[in-house]
A protein has these predicted regions:
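A glycine-rich, hydrophobic/aromatic-adjacent loop/helix-cap motif
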Residues: 1-163
């Protein structure tokens, strides 16, 4: 069995939703708007800030259990979806209620550069083939809420976007 640790919009991914998921904690990293989507949630002209994992702290997300017969297909799909030269595909240990598991995680090298007002404006302006920046944050906020997880950054930004 393979595991995938989801911490951003991947938590709302329809393909992964077919597999059992459990809350999981990744120590040593936290969520930040550390990347840009220029295709899925944004465009080259109006890139959408998206979440990445940056060193320090901890991050709660979901660990999806992928059966062996689906591992190669899921890995290819995720590599295509998550591919960006800033990201490194690595295996990390994540803690779940049933113990530690080794999971695929995409980790960033650096954090956000925008203040809250600039980040909000960029999210409102972004539109891509999957959706817009506001929908991106909604997807993450709802997935966190659905699983009883909390992230102050995501929740504060979502509140700003819907007000």
């Amino acid at each position: 069995m393979g595991w995938v640790f989801a911490y951003g919009s991947l938590m709302g991914d329809a393909v992964l939703a077919r597999y059992p998921a459990r809350p999981a904690r990744l120590a040593g990293y936290h969520r930040e708007f550390a990347h840009e989507s220029r295709r899925r949630w944004g465009s080259p002209e109006r890139p959408c800030p998206i979440l990445g994992l940056v060193q320090g702290g901890e991050c709660w997300g979901l660990a999806y259990a992928v059966p062996p017969e689906d591992e190669a297909r899921i890995a290819r799909g995720l590599a295509h979806r998550e591919a960006a030269k800033e990201r490194l595909r690595v295996v990390k240990m994540v803690e779940t209620p049933d113990g530690e598991v080794s999971a695929w995680v995409w980790v960033s090298g650096e954090g956000a550069r925008d203040d809250a007002a600039t980040l909000e404006a960029r999210l409102r302006a972004a539109h891509g083939i999957v959706g817009n920046g506001t929908e991106y944050v909604r997807t993450v906020a709802q997935a966190l809420d659905q699983h009883g997880l909390h992230d102050p950054l995501v929740n504060a930004l979502w509140s700003r976007l819907v007000s």
